[in-house]
């Protein structure tokens, strides 16, 4: 049977507390987000939010071409 070094107990307490706090913060962040949530309580439905979630392809390609050609430097 392995012997336990009790001098490492504070280390395990600190690391364990850090893991628990990180997990709790992540859970709180995910559950309070307006678009992505772990529960449906307080979740924003798509019909209630008419704004687009993603940038359309033409806007993206326009930004890319502006950067690629260096037009933003010339203006």
Curated annotation (Swiss-Prot):
UniProt keyword Transmembrane present: yes
Protein name: Uncharacterized transmembrane protein SSD449
The keyword Disulfide bond is assigned to this record: no
Protein source organism: Dictyostelium discoideum
Membrane topology reported for the UniProt record: Single-pass membrane protein
Source taxonomy: Eukaryota, Amoebozoa, Evosea, Eumycetozoa, Dictyostelia
Inducing factors: By removal of nutrients, in a cAMP-independent manner.
Disulphide bridges, residue numbers: none
A Gene Ontology cellular-component term: membrane
